[in-house]
């Protein structure tokens, strides 16, 4: 594939807080920034790693952290009769803008926050499903959501969706589309300067597109 991600899956980091306590500390919607900082510090100490290998552009920040929490996401919790804060216990990608750059021991900056349960929300299967994680990784690569945050119907559902929902950056369906692949530099255009024949292969199995 065009993208190869290298990293490390750690043991669970325990902040010694219940989900209710985390909600109380999240008054300014930035407590996950502190969790990121604490978790990165814990990682450096536990694994004796300065994290320079995860700073490919040498800006003093880890290129990306997947911060996965063990609590239910709020929607799953709702199905099980548990009330969880929807602003905190959901999936999103953000940046700790207060983190300081450190070239010798890079700190966490850009990260996504998502529940472990998202791995099992698949389409009629009990197997591991990575759609939400792929969607959030798209954000980490600079892609935006391909739907409107503000145009909703009376039930609160998005009604403006140029991709019709059928896209990874829209409704977490399929894969990254041809436009996204082009924006990310995964495919290259043909420069036609003379008569000839070009074979366009399937976009699902190649990087070709029109």
Language-model segment annotations:
Residues 64, 70-210:
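Extracellular hydrolytic enzyme modules, especially secreted metalloproteases
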Residues 1-104:
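Active-site-proximal segments of metallohydrolase catalytic domains
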């Amino acid at each position: 594939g065009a993208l190869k991600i290298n990293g490390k899956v750690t043991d669970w980091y325990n902040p010694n807080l219940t989900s209710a306590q985390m909600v109380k500390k999240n008054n300014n919607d930035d407590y996950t920034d502190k969790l990121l900082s604490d978790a990165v510090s814990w990682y450096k100490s536990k694994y004796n790693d300065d994290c320079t290998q995860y700073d490919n552009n040498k800006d003093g920040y880890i290129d990306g952290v997947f911060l996965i929490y063990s609590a239910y996401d709020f929607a799953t919790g709702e199905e099980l009769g548990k009330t969880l804060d929807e602003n905190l216990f959901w999936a999103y990608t953000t940046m700790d803008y207060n983190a300081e750059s450190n070239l010798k021991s890079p700190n966490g900056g850009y990260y996504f926050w998502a529940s472990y349960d998202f791995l099992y929300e698949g389409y009629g299967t009990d197997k591991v499903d990575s759609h939400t994680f792929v969607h959030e990784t798209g954000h980490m690569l600079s892609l935006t959501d391909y739907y409107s945050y503000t145009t909703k119907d009376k039930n609160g559902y998005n009604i403006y969706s140029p991709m019709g929902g059928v896209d990874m950056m829209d409704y977490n369906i399929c894969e990254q589309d041809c436009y996204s692949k082009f924006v990310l530099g995964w495919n290259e255009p043909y420069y036609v300067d003379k008569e000839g024949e070009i074979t366009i292969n399937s976009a699902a199995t190649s990087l070709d597109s029109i």
